Curated annotation (Swiss-Prot):
Protein name: Neuropathy target esterase sws
Residue intervals annotated with topology Cytoplasmic: 56-1514
Residues annotated to bind a nucleoside 3',5'-cyclic phosphate 2: 515-644
Keyword Hydrolase: yes
One Gene Ontology term from the biological process aspect of the record: protein localization to membrane
Lineage top rank: taxon: Eukaryota
GO terms, molecular function: lysophospholipase activity; protein kinase A catalytic subunit binding
Organism: Drosophila ananassae
Length: 1514
């Protein structure tokens, strides 16, 4: 706020305008140019004091005279002199005793007339009450509690009790999945101990690669050998770590053991190594085939999540991960159309890190069968990024240059081609549209990706095809190279009419049989599942991230192109390019699509036909059926994937590690050697620094996709912090040696890291200067407020947790894909025994898959400490503790147990308030003080439907309709959703005196522009306006209160009465405090609807201070304490003196106190003393008048900063090296000379005070997270409060035009849009059906189903209370179907699931179908007799049982609790009838319904046991 023209006030009447303006100008000039006024004020004060003392003494003399006259009258009447008389001591004691007894009657509590020491106790109670009077009058303070030691320290348990060799063994083979104890003991029998001296080789080139090595003591160096004889270290293996390649493990199991070609391991010092031969696993797998299947699946998952995630997303390697150039198996099939393609295909593989690429001659060579069998052509179909992948690192223009290192004559089509034009039509829309029996298994598809399998020799197909395929003269086939003549018609682009399709199908069956490694006598197994299709150019087979169209494709003719999304979407958009880039081609004789068959992931590639092609394919469900009969094809599929990978991937497999960390375990510790970096695959990490004094402080937190320790590894410095796991986490470890080897071979890696580190350092520089003040809360550190998993815990049973979760889910859907999980959902999806220890691997894998597919996953806990609740605690990044704001704040036993179980997880409190109440949040401090473990709180205003008591069925039915509507982005649920996903929008209001009325107009413009406000911060007048908005959230009420306060500030006669002797300030601040206190009352910052902070200048600690809790009016007053006019506010917390925060940052208890503190203009109002610590607080504008940087540190992703402060004149006169005051006086008074602009002494002092504020303001203007706005209000003075309406209108008009221009320019989307508004596509949106984890061991080996037939009996009472079953059907779609709605129109988990999950497809004959339709219609109208309907239901149950038995013969049993779903189908028509005939007495109706459901469940248990589609009967 300005110091100049402080006493000037606008005239209240037109007839006094001239006089008041002249008087104000005169007074302002006197204040500016001389000190006479100060002396005059002092003299007036002394005269007033003397006058007051004189009249007070005169009044005392009068009273004394009257008393003497009265005494004289008494003496005269009594005839004696009473001057010497006095009270006796006994009379005095009696008098004072009676007075005390009268006061003792007011003491609370019963006075006992007997008992030892009762009088003493009564007196002590009375004294205690008197002593506590002042403490009770003080406002309630927030209790500051240091976080527990476990929050910042790693867990150290008794793991030393396990023998070291067994412990290291367990940790090393954990990468193969979960092993039962007998299996582990059998593996231990095959271990060998190797003792190596320094310099001894553990293994070297040409040694067989057939063992797993675990270092028990010492150190081993793993390095690669270059062609010139030099070596390059990959990693150093220390105690407890292992050396192995999972890709070699698959080679050994498939019967093709390899040897070390470039990798060598040598002991650095004396070491002891445990050797576990891979053959030991073969022996175990023979007796436990399910273990083999699970190990293969785990290896494939690791291949996706670790290798592809690390190498692609962070190092920028894409096409280098697969062998781009493959050779044909037969000379009759030569697809390349250019010499370079033929040449590159002869090389057969990518170069390794240490071996240069081979060159090819100009002659075309035919690959031999042996060589062709060596090089497999599968495709690694996914990169491990599941669902909505994290924002990838953008490749530069040089992303293709590394190919020239391995191929001197690269094919431009292969290397530098990007996709253009349309993406092509869908394969299932154009290719499969008119074919019968296409969608046989379409309804049963899960989320899987691409898989590579071995190719069969196409030349071997010709003898089986008869004379039709050996006719010469058919010419060149499409897609074949020039000079390739006489190709069989099957392998050409000849029209299908010229070829017998039966022969084509037979050829396709034989080829796919060989690819799957099946003998010839097993052709009948795959023959029914093989389909052949003709493709036109640019037809899309599958898109990246899609799981619906997953198949194994075999290319018979033509060419398929494999693309991947361009990671630098912004650069591609600027260059008008497509976001897809070519990875490689798939030629005739090769297969593609299938890694997800083993992992359950979606496709990471987009596959299109390059030209006219013919492909044979097998759908995913058919592959699983074949696996069930021939489990060994899993090895063939896995071996095909491995052989397709480039040697670079195999070398990286030796160095990259997959690390599992339980909650509390440390990744690395402070001061350790930095020899690697880590990639967070799942979970959450916390970085903690230990200061020399032993104090620990949080530096930051890392979530999924973040790099940890990269800066220290690159700079080769020791670890500066300790990083520990907040919850169970998975990480990929990238050693420094591997990183150096890759960057030497592929310079693109350096470009990637420079881009990554530049963004990280830029963010650090922008937030460094605005870190929290000393003594600030832990959460004030720059912690990433973006969570992947959220656990919801009710405080009491009265909390409507299910409706709350639905509302939060609804709001989160506006941001991205989200999933809601409950214990019933998980049981129905995976079985009732899923929470047992034996199913740990399956459960964690399934949950990890769901988390990867969604931006956020909601875990709804039970109301008791069940196994599911404990699992939610382990999986959660943050825990939301939900309570009723009007209820009791006491902590229950269940809540304390949660704090004990999740000691390190961040917890936030959510208080719910009904919309019908007119009250505002109150007593929030009592909630927070009772829960010191809570780091943040949210006030949520709930609609009426949340608190309406309904059965679970009615809740599901209600929200199935609510989800079809658009969420209200201005609601508290949307605000909470944006906070959880890191999309909060902050509003920062700067200081500027009366010009702050423009904030009201800007608030109205922001509201009309549809921009939600999630957080508010303010300084000086901005603190006042921001606090009004957070308290009211109604622009009309805010305008009214702001106008009333401005009118009070125009009453200059009240301010004159507040004048005081100007030692500290000109005004005492009493009247100013009263105006702010009357505006807010005794409201605390914690009780505001919207998170709020104000900033003040702490002159006690010489820093700015951020207030997020405490007295509102006090800190607002302190932030407005302009120096010289008001005294600093004394902080009651620590006694520090606080001034206007604008002195350090001019844009940023009880509410009014900190508002007052933020308005303490130095010199005008005294500093405000903080009641907590006694610090003196002044106006925040002295340090930061627009604290947008503070808002960014508190978690706001997008910020709108409004600046209304004054601007200094920078056009000053250059007067030379010295300055004479007499010369300035002459220039000032001489009208014939040009005026000079030289700052006077007060102006210089003001500019010095605002130095840091101006610097901070420039940083805010240049930041990328802030939208800086300055309305045109420079013509209004600081104290022009009488022009409130005019200034407000200026701000409104300017803001409205500003946001309209932003909308036209397309820049408004970041404030009100966070996702693509296009309608959701089924292939790209998360559905619980689509991403169900596929346990191959259970499918293939017929393991006992965890969801046995009696699972419906266990949960029969709950089936009608939860309608979230997501069940894929396994029935053919070429038959007639009837869609029966499930109970309650179950709420889906995504937009596309609303179509697929709500309806259950049943296959019925015509008669039953017609009867069911008739029955459903009659029930809906309430006109059908129960007996007739029950008879039809029995008929339907029999029909469903028959169909179930029929489909079970061809399909593997699903992991769904179908019986529970069947019960829901049975009850749904009855519940529809109940809704229409519902009696007013809802309570009795619900009791009758519960009894009827129990009766139905009991009868069902007797009637149907073990059936998968058993139905209930009344």
């Amino acid at each position: 706020m300005d110091v100049l023209e402080l006493l000037r006030a606008s005239a209240t009447g037109s007839y006094t305008a001239l006089f008041s303006d002249a008087w104000c100008q005169y007074v302002s000039k006197q204040i500016t140019n001389s000190m006479y006024l100060y002396c005059a004020l002092g003299v007036l004060s002394m005269v007033f004091l003397a006058w007051f003392m004189y009249f007070k003494r005169l009044a005392r003399i009068r009273l004394r005279d009257e008393a003497s006259r009265s005494m004289s009258a008494v003496n005269s009447s009594s005839g004696g002199d009473l001057r010497g008389l006095r009270f006796r001591k006994r009379d005095k004691m009696l008098f004072y005793g009676r007075r005390m007894l009268r006061k003792m009657k007011n003491v609370s509590g019963q006075m006992y007339s007997s008992g030892k020491g009762y009088k003493r106790r009564a007196v002590m109670r009375f004294a205690r009450r008197i002593l506590q009077l002042r403490r009770d009058n003080m406002p309630l303070e927030m209790r500051t509690v240091e976080p527990p030691a476990e929050y910042l320290e790693e867990t150290i348990d008794g793991s030393d009790r396990v023998p070291p060799d067994a412990l290291y063994m367990l940790q090393s083979i954990r990468i193969f999945g979960h092993f039962e104890k007998p299996v582990f003991l059998r593996l231990c029998k095959h271990t060998q101990l190797l003792e190596l001296m320094a310099g001894d080789y553990l293994f070297k080139i040409t040694d067989p690669d057939d063992s797993v090595y675990i270092v028990q003591s010492g150190m081993i160096n793993v390095y690669i050998s270059n062609a010139d004889g030099s070596t390059l270290s990959l990693k150093t293996v220390r105690k407890g770590e292992s050396v192995t390649s999972l890709l070699s493990f698959i080679d050994v199991l498939s019967g093709n053991p390899s040897y070390y070609k470039t990798v060598t391991a040598k002991a650095i010092e004396k070491s002891v190594v445990i050797r576990l031969p891979m053959e030991a696993f073969e022996e175990v797998f023979q007796d436990n085939p399910d273990v083999m299947i699970r190990v293969i699946q785990v290896i494939m998952i690791r291949l996706q999540r670790v290798l592809f995630t690390a190498l692609r997303n962070y190092l920028g390697l894409n096409a280098e991960l697969v062998q781009n150039h493959m050779r044909f198996k037969s000379s009759t099939i030569m697809a390349p159309s250019t010499h370079s393609s033929q040449c590159s295909r002869q090389t057969g593989s990518q170069p390794t890190l240490g071996v240069p690429a081979p060159t090819c001659s100009n002659t075309t060579t035919t690959a031999s069968p042996t060589t062709a069998n060596t090089v497999h052509s599968g495709l690694a179909g996914a990169n491990g990024v599941i669902g909505q992948s994290r924002p990838p690192i953008s490749p530069s223009r040089h992303s293709r240059e590394e190919h020239t290192l391995s191929d001197p004559n690269p094919n431009p089509d292969v290397i530098n081609t990007s996709v253009g034009g349309a993406s092509g039509t869908s394969m299932y829309a154009e290719v499969h549209g008119d074919a019968p029996n296409v969608d046989v298994f379409h309804q049963q598809q899960h989320s899987v990706g691409n898989l590579s399998t071995r190719r069969g020799s196409i030349s071997q197909m010709a003898p089986d095809l008869g004379p039709a395929l050996s006719q010469p003269g058919l010419g060149q086939g499409q897609g074949l190279g020039p000079g390739v003549t006489g190709a069989p018609p099957l392998m050409t682009g000849a029209p299908a009419s010229k070829i017998d399709m039966r022969l084509v199908h037979a050829s396709a069956v034989d080829s796919l049989r060989k690819e799957l490694g099946l003998p010839e006598e097993d052709s009948h197994i795959i023959e029914p599942f093989v389909e052949v299709r003709e493709l036109e150019p640019n037809v899309t087979l599958i898109t990246e991230g899609n799981s619906d169209d997953v198949c194994v494709w075999f290319v018979m003719t033509g060419t398929l192109a494999v693309y991947q999304a361009n990671q630098d979407a912004a650069r591609a958009k600027q260059q008008q390019e497509k976001n897809d880039m070519l990875i490689h081609f798939v030629h005739p004789g090769e297969i593609v699509g299938g890694l997800a068959m083993l992992t359950g992931e979606a496709s990471a590639y987009t596959i299109r036909s390059r030209n006219n092609s013919r492909v044979a394919f097998i759908r995913r469900a058919a592959i699983y059926q074949i696996m069930r009969q021939r489990p060994r094809i899993v090895l063939d599929l896995g071996n095909g994937v491995v052989r397709r990978l480039s040697p670079l991937v195999r070398q990286c497999d030796y160095a990259l590690d997959w690390i599992f960390l339980e909650s509390g375990r440390a990744v690395y510790r402070q001061d350790e050697i930095s020899d690697s970096t880590y990639i967070v695959l799942s979970g959450r990490m916390r970085s903690v620094i230990t200061h020399p004094g032993g104090k620990k402080e949080i530096i930051g937190e890392y979530g999924k996709g973040d790099l940890v320790g990269i800066v220290e590894m690159i700079t080769e410095t020791s670890r500066t912090t300790t990083v520990l796991a907040v919850r169970d986490s998975e990480l990929a470890k990238l050693p420094e040696g591997l990183f150096n080897a890759i960057k030497l071979r592929y310079p693109i890696v350096v470009t990637k890291l420079i881009s990554f580190l530049s963004h990280r350092f830029l963010g650090t520089m922008q937030t460094r200067s605005s870190s929290a003040a000393p003594g600030g809360p832990v959460e004030a550190n720059p912690v990433t407020h973006k969570y992947s998993t959220v656990a919801l815990v009710p405080i009491t049973d009265e909390v409507p947790l299910t409706p709350f979760t639905y509302e939060l889910y609804h709001s989160l859907c506006a941001i991205g894909p989200v999933l809601r999980l409950t214990s019933d959902v998980v049981r129905k999806q995976l079985g009732p025994n899923i929470f047992e220890a034996a199913n740990e691997y399956r459960l964690t894998s399934w949950l990890a898959q769901q988390e990867d597919r969604n931006i956020i996953t909601l875990y709804q806990c039970d109301n008791a400490l069940s196994a599911w609740t404990q699992r939610c605690m382990r999986q959660a990044d943050v825990i939301l503790i939900v309570g009723l704001g009007n209820g009791s704040h006491l902590v229950g036993k269940f809540e304390r147990e949660i704090d004990r179980l999740a000691m390190r997880t961040q917890k936030e409190l959510v208080l719910l308030y009904p919309e019908t109440t007119n009250s505002k949040p109150a007593n929030t401090l009592s909630w927070l003080n009772a829960r010191p473990w809570v780091t943040k709180h949210h006030h949520v205003l709930c609609v009426k439907r949340i608190f309406t008591r309904k059965s679970q069925y009615r809740i599901n039915d209600l929200y199935s309709r609510v989800l079809l509507s658009e969420p209200n982005m201005h609601s508290d649920f949307s605000r909470l959703a944006r906070w959880l996903t890191g999309n909060s929008i902050g509003l920062v209001l700067g200081g500027g005196g009366a010009r702050g009325a423009a904030h009201i107009g800007m608030l109205k413009a922001i509201q009309e522009a549809g921009i939600p406000i999630d957080m508010v911060g303010g300084v000086s007048i901005g603190a006042l306006m921001g606090a009004l908005w957070c308290s009211e959230r109604n622009i009309t009420t805010v305008t009214q209160k702001a106008r009333e306060w401005s009118k009070k500030m125009t009453k200059w006669f009240l301010q004159l009465l507040d004048l005081t002797y100007p030692i500290t300030s000109m005004f005492s601040g009493r009247e100013f405090n009263k105006t702010i206190h009357d505006t807010f009352g005794d409201v605390s910052i914690e009780d505001l609807w919207i998170p709020y902070f104000t900033l003040t200048t702490d002159i006690t600690a010489s820093c700015h201070r951020i207030h997020t809790n405490g007295s509102l009016w006090r800190y607002v007053r302190s932030s407005m304490s302009l120096s010289g006019y008001m005294p600093p506010l004394c902080d009651p917390k620590d006694g520090h003196l606080l001034l206007d925060g604008g002195y350090v940052n001019n844009l940023p208890g009880q509410l009014w106190r900190y508002c007052r503190a933020s308005m303490s203009i130095a010199g005008v109002f005294p500093p405000f003393c903080d009641y907590r610590d006694g610090h003196l607080l002044l106006d925040g504008c002295y340090t930061n008048n627009v604290p947008a940087d503070v808002m960014h540190n508190l978690g706001a992703a997008h910020i709108i900063a409004i600046d209304v402060g004054s601007q200094d004149d920078t056009d000053l006169t250059n007067y030379g090296d010295d300055l004479s005051g007499w010369w300035l006086l002459y220039k000032k008074w001489n009208p014939f000379t040009s005026p000079v602009k030289v700052p006077d002494l007060p102006d210089i002092q003001s500019r010095l005070a605002y130095v840091s504020c101006v610097r901070q303001l420039e940083e805010v203007k240049n930041s990328d997270y802030c939208e800086y706005i300055r309305p045109p209000i420079d013509k209004y003075k600081t104290l022009a409060f009488g022009s409130f309406d005019e200034i407000r209108d200026v701000g409104y008009v300017f803001g409205k035009n500003y946001f309209e221009n932003m909308a036209k320019a397309g820049r408004l989307g970041r404030f009100n849009q966070w996702f693509n508004k296009e309608p959701p596509k089924r292939g790209n949106h998360a559905s619980l059906n689509e991403y169900t984890f596929i346990d191959l061991a259970q499918i293939v080996c017929r393991l006992p189903e965890t969801n046995a037939g009696n699972s419906a009996d266990i949960f029969s009472e709950d089936e009608d209370c939860d309608g979230y079953i997501s069940e894929p059907t396994t029935l053919n779609t070429d038959r007639r179907r009837i869609q029966v709605p499930r109970a309650g129109n179950s709420l889906s988990f995504s937009e596309n699931e609303m179509d697929s999950d709500v309806e259950l497809d049943l296959q019925l004959d015509r008669k039953t179908e017609k009867s069911i339709h008739s029955a459903a219609t009659s029930v809906a109208r309430g006109s059908m007799r129960s007996r007739e309907f029950h008879k039809l239901e029995q008929d339907r149950s029999v029909e469903i049982t028959r169909l179930k038995d029929e489909t079970e013969r061809i399909m593997a049993p699903t992991n769904l609790d179908r019986k529970g779903d069947g019960q829901e189908q049975e009850k749904e028509p009855e519940q529809e009838q109940e809704l229409e005939t519902e009696e007013p007495n809802q309570e009795n109706t619900e009791v009758e319904e519960e009894q009827r459901n129990q009766g139905e469940g009991n009868e069902d248990n007797k009637e149907n046991k073990g059936g998968a589609y058993n139905e209930t009967k009344n």
